[in-house]
Amino acid sequence: MESNRGQGSIQQLLAAEVEAQHIVNAARTAKMARLKQAKEEAEKEIAEYKAQTEQDFQRKLEETSGDSGANVKRLEQETDTKIEQLKNEASRISKDVVEMLLKHVTTVKN
């Protein structure tokens, strides 16, 4: 009778071990599935962030390039205006400058 009892206890232990192994395997599988899902979600977030960052960069690049062209045009206009002002000023005072130079060159001092 004692051997039947021992035999039953061994069978119970083996069954418990098999059940525990199934529980451990199920937990391991669930953990791997959660890790895989987390990895996929992280990769998706990274891709979205990267796309948004690239879009922001391209937008800013276009804005600064457009500003650069506008700045060049504005500077050219300002330069042309300034050159025209200087030409007008030079033509206005050139007669006086020529007279002053002639006076100094032709005047003899003792």
Curated annotation (Swiss-Prot):
Region annotated Disordered, chain positions: 60-80
Subunit structure, interactors included: V-ATPase is a heteromultimeric enzyme composed of a peripheral catalytic V1 complex (components A to H) attached to an integral membrane V0 proton pore complex (components: a, c, c'', d and e).
InterPro entries in the cross-refs: V-ATPase_G
Keywords recorded for this protein, A-Z: Acetylation, Cell membrane, Hydrogen ion transport, Ion transport, Membrane, Transport, Vacuole
Protein name per Swiss-Prot or TrEMBL: V-type proton ATPase subunit G1
The protein's role, per its UniProt record: Catalytic subunit of the peripheral V1 complex of vacuolar ATPase (V-ATPase). V-ATPase is responsible for acidifying a variety of intracellular compartments in eukaryotic cells.
Modified sites of kind N-acetylmethionine: M1
Main location: membrane
GO cellular component, one term: vacuole
Pfam family, one: V-ATPase_G
GO molecular function, one term: proton-transporting ATPase activity, rotational mechanism
The keyword Ion transport is annotated on this UniProt entry: yes
Family named by the database record: Belongs to the V-ATPase G subunit family.
Gene3D superfamilies: 1.20.5.2950
UniProt organism field: Arabidopsis thaliana
